[in-house]
Amino acid sequence: MIRGNDPILLTPGPLTTSLATKQAMLRDWGSWDAAFNAITGSLCEDLVRIVHGEGTHVCVPMQGSGTFSVEAAIANVVPRDGKVLVPQNGAYCQRILKICKVLGRAHVELPIPEDRPATAAAIEAALKKDPSITHVAQVHCETGAGVLNPLPEIAAVCARLGKGLIVDAMSSFGAIEIDARTMPFDALVAATGKCIEGVPGMGFVLVKKTVLEGSQGNSHSLALDLYDQYTYMQKTTQWRFTPPTHVVAAFRTALDQFLEEGGQPVRGERYRRNYETLVQGMAVLGFRPFLSPDVQAPIIVTFHAPADARYDFRTFYEKVRSRGYILYPGKLTQVETFRVGCIGAIDDNEMRNVVSAIGETLREMGISMQPEGRVRAA
């Protein structure tokens, strides 16, 4: 799917983008220009449609990385006297805990092993144990290891117990089904440089209208105030502060390609084929995935590092990179791993090519793989 000599990014974002998406950034836009503001408006409408949130939810775009929008969502949706339950099974859950701490929001951590998903039963028990909890902040796809947390069941528990739900869908939005009609949430956060296959620089929050209307004054920040951002956009069609114009234009092109491809079902199926091709090919080389297939999201796969003493991730990374592929280091605490992403403007043929590149690298490093061998400790 990719032409030219650019490296293929096998990461959970930034990721490899199409030529058309890159070309969309060749034009300059005025941030107050009506044509540019129409692009922003059309993006927001389409993003709400992807989760079937028409009439109940609105889209608030926000400058910056996805984490900016996660912080904005927590700061606006959770009142200053609120309390957040954070099911924690990875690095991005830990980031939410840090955000809550910095914001001064009371919070409770629900520890979960990094190779297991959160469960609705555990969340329900935690909510019943502490009735003062007002919200749950749930990472949908925890890309620290690649775990897919069961959002439909968690959303049902929150709705039944009257708790607000904030979803970090950074690495799942556009690839895994999310339906606001059957998975109620107060806010859902994603970003341009993930499964819609745009470039980094803008996040967005899909927030329930009634929740946003009641959030005035909650935010600790001027720049991250979703209520102010939305009301200003409604009045003027403009962003409050300078938007990432090239990022927005590229995202419009990426979203057009997403819709032309067939939307979430087809995009998700392509990523699943990428995942299956990768795992099957790596198994032939002797690599074992860290996660069980029943909890693995088809977004990024964590593999155990070779047990061979000659293995060094930096050397391995550079040699694979010299063959045109950029991998991701592991983010786990107990075992040494590395990660390979399955998302971006790539297909299963590209996954076969990366498996070949990894196999060549192993031979060059003199590494012998034993599929059932030891796992090298971190």
From Swiss-Prot:
Gene3D superfamilies found in the cross-reference section: Aspartate Aminotransferase, domain 1, Type I PLP-dependent aspartate aminotransferase-like (Major domain)
EC number of the protein: 2.6.1.37
Protein's GO biological process: organic phosphonate catabolic process
GO terms, molecular function: 2-aminoethylphosphonate-pyruvate transaminase activity
Primary role: Involved in phosphonate degradation.
Similarity field: Belongs to the class-V pyridoxal-phosphate-dependent aminotransferase family. PhnW subfamily.
Designated name of the protein: 2-aminoethylphosphonate--pyruvate transaminase 1
Record organism: Cupriavidus pinatubonensis (strain JMP 134 / LMG 1197) (Cupriavidus necator (strain JMP 134))
Gene: phnW1
